[in-house]
Amino acid sequence: MDSNNSKKGSSVKSPCQTPRSTEKSNRDFRVDSNSNSNPVSKNEKEKGVNIQVIVRCRPFNSEETRLQTPAVLTCNDRKKEVAVAQNIAGKQIDKTFLFDKVFGPTSQQKDLYHQAVSPIVFEVLDGYNCTIFAYGQTGTGKTYTMEGGARKKNGEIPSDAGVIPRAVKQIFDILEAQSAAEYSLKVSFLELYNEELTDLLAPEETKFADDKSKKPLALMEDGKGGVFVRGLEEEIVSTADEIYKVLEKGSAKRRTAETLLNKQSSRSHSIFSVTIHIKECTPEGEEIVKSGKLNLVDLAGSENISRSGAREGRAREAGEINKSLLTLGRVINALVEHSGHIPYRESKLTRLLRDSLGGKTKTCVIATVSPSVHCLEETLSTLDYAHRAKHIKNKPEVNQKMMKSAIMKDLYSEIERLKQEVYAAREKNGIYIPKERYTQEEAEKKAMADKIEQMEVEGEAKDKQIIDLQELYNSEQLVTAGLREKLDKTEKKLYETEQALLDLEEKHRQAVATIKEKEYLISNLLKSEKTLVDRAVELQAELANAASDVSNLFAKIGRKDKIEDSNRSLIQDFQSQLLRQLELLNNSVAGSVSQQEKQLQDMENVMVSFVSAKTKATETLRGSLAQLKEKYNTGIKSLDDIAGNLDKDSQSTLNDLNSEVTKHSCALEDMFKGFTSEAYTLLEGLQGSLHNQEEKLSAFTQQQRDLHSRSMDSAKSVSTVMLDFFKTLDTHANKLTKLAEDAQNVNEQKLSAFTKKFEESIANEEKQMLEKVAELLASSNARKKELVQIAVQDIRQGSSSQTGALQQEMSAMQDSASSIKVQWNSHIVQAESHHLDNISAVEVAKEDMQKMHLKCLENSKTGTQQWKTAQESLVDLEKRNVATADSIIRGAIENNEKLRTQFSSAVSTTLSDVDSSNREIISSIDNSLQLDKDASTDVNSTIVPCSENLKELRTHHDDNVVEIKQNTGKCLGHEYKVDEATSSTPRKREYNIPTVGSIEELKTPSFEELLKAFHDCKSPKQMQNGEAKHVSNGRPPLTAIN
């Protein structure tokens, strides 16, 4: 955490001011610290020492007392416990923490210091580096605990003095009490503000005196796992008052501010370090210097910005404070969990405290908390981190002590450095040194020279003293060697005598034990012999009983053999009789075969008649299919005629339209010629032309009505033809197979859909014809052509796809035909109703056109003045209409011709497909007939071996079965002998046959096992007293065992 910690002995100079040089040099003349008393044992050093954690609770402040704020914290100083009351989900829950020491709100500064801090000061004087830092929320008394109240003018320590002044006073009291000891103290005061290090003891430069600017310091690694602050000012102090002045000087420079939680809140972390050097003499007379360091850290408190009221710069300060404290908490967690990575480098605070947390420094944490309920969350956080910090282990080590020669060398290098500074100041070539410092350094040099001279004199005296002590030591060593030789001889003789006595006692004990073992073996052998005799008598009785039972069993076996011989002869006789009966039964079965042959001949005749009937039915089916083909051809031809009529009507309609358009064009030309001669004549001609157009449109409407009537008649004729076709199909439906019925059903559905689409097309044409005559005819022809093509293509595809499935779907044709009849009739009625609706719509359109004509006459009167402009537009319009109408009419005629050609080719293709389908049907029927004939032949060849007279067989079979039953009952029921009980057969009983294991158990165990059991059964008391008893009483005689 500090530079002295990392440098250890190399940073210690003389009792005067230590130079602020950053040079490090290795020393080969260190004295091992283990030569002096070390309060840390080797075991403790290896395992580590837990950080000491102390909790202090502040009392309520005036504001909290005025508001009567409830307390949530209870401190038990005796049990060292802190209990926090929480209200979670309406339940009162207490959380208890256990710490090393606990100080309640009523505790005094002196109590905390004497119980917790005072032992640490003694460890610092023993050569350890120790750290004490206060941790907690802002406003909980950290600075008060570390620094306390203002010092009295007379220099006495006030009652509310904190840890720092009391520790300083204790150090000087102890050092001054050791009058013979020489010592020196150095202090440094460091501030960490917004992650920048500042030396609070550095002298301020004149030009920055007004704004109190503070130069930031650099934090450097020392290469040994520690850190040091480059350029940190260290002041030599010789009295406690000087330290108090230094403390007041640095505290005045610390950054503080007022917040809602604290009137004087510290906005930075501060580290006050006291370094002590004490000179000691070794038993060899060598002068060494031991060093210890006390770091007193006052951390800025964590705060909630919303509660503290921090804004802008204060908010940034609070953020930096919370960030560094959060990193400190993460370091504590990582150390407790023994994590592989400890985030020391994430904050300068944790880098400075690195040796205090998990390092070689003894550390004490004073956690300050508030009892107020408003600070419950912060209090719990502080207590949780403090409780975790308890488990952090440090491995404190005593600082290495420096020999006098090392100090002398450092002093010489310091003198050389000071000489260079003086020379540079004299020549004005270097760094300026203040007069006060120059005077002080000169005085220190003189004092140092005097001390060096004094040390040399003392060194010579010590050398003489060491020589005298060495001579005394050598003489004492000679006397001790003579006494040690005599003692060794006496001890050797005593040892030999004791060994001889032990050998004799061992031999006597072994002899007594051997006699007891032999007696124990003999007693076990006699016991085994007696057991064997008793067991042999029991086995002799069991053997006699078994012999009697065996004789009775042999007698019973003889009786059973006689009965078995008689039963064997009886069974042989029964077998011969049974064979004779079975032979008779076989003869009767053979006689019945001839009768069954006659029955099978009759069956063959029946099959022949079946085949002939099947042939006649096939011929009838073939004729029905021929009639079906003729009817189908008739329907297709009628469709062809309908299409031809439709084509003729369309051509005539188009020709009429063309003539009307031509007439209309001529009339327009004549009318416009008349207009050029006279406007009045033009108006009359226009009116007459309009009348002519009205008449022609009426005639055209009547013509379209007649055309639609003819189309409706054609549709009705198609419906009549289809109805006749369905009636004819119904008469032959029962004679057709499954194949023809389904194909015709599909064709009927296709024709029905075609008729429906055709009627819908006619209705649509009637609605649109009055609006656009030429465009309607062209689209009508196109739709008609498309409908016919779709219908013909569907019929063709249906005929080709359904031919293969006719043999599986024919049975459902009759029901489908009847349902289609009903649907066809309904379609006819619906088409007629649609025709009537269309006629009424045409009449309405006619009335609308008449109205429009009247309106046109009225408009013509108002357009007389604009006839010149309209003449040119009408002429152009006439030309465009004539050209458009001609192109439309020619396209319609060409489309009708193509439609006629495609329709005829489709009909011829359909007829050829139907012929091929009929041929395939007839071929399949012939194949079926041939298969029936083959099946009849196979049946005749199979049933020939099965002819037999079943009636005679049944009669003879019954007689033979009755006779066999009678013989079986006589043989097995009356003549078969049974073994009767004589009550002389011995009953089953259990024999006590000894097992191999039980026989083995009767054997006497081996001598080794007996001896082992003998030794195991001896009690501790017998083992202790047995030898003495045997020696005094002797062994018992063997006759007593027998």
Curated annotation (Swiss-Prot):
Disruption phenotype: Radially swollen roots without any depletion or disorientation of cortical microtubules or cellulose microfibrils. It comes from Arabidopsis thaliana. This is Kinesin-like protein KIN-5A. ATP binds at residues 136-143. Responsible for microtubule translocation. May be important for the organization of phragmoplast-specific arrays of microtubules. Plays an essential role in stabilizing the mitotic spindle. Required during mitotic cytokinesis. Residues 480-517 form a coiled coil. Belongs to the TRAFAC class myosin-kinesin ATPase superfamily. Kinesin family. KIN-5/BimC subfamily. Pfam families: Kinesin. SUPFAM superfamilies: P-loop containing nucleoside triphosphate hydrolases (SSF52540). Residues 21-31 have a biased composition (Basic and acidic residues). Its main location: cytoplasm. One of its GO terms (molecular function) is microtubule binding. Residues 50-392 form the Kinesin motor domain. Residues 1-14 have a biased composition (Low complexity). Keywords: ATP-binding, Coiled coil, Cytoplasm, Cytoskeleton, Microtubule, Motor protein, Nucleotide-binding. Residues 32-41 have a biased composition (Polar residues). Gene3D superfamilies: Kinesin motor domain (3.40.850.10).
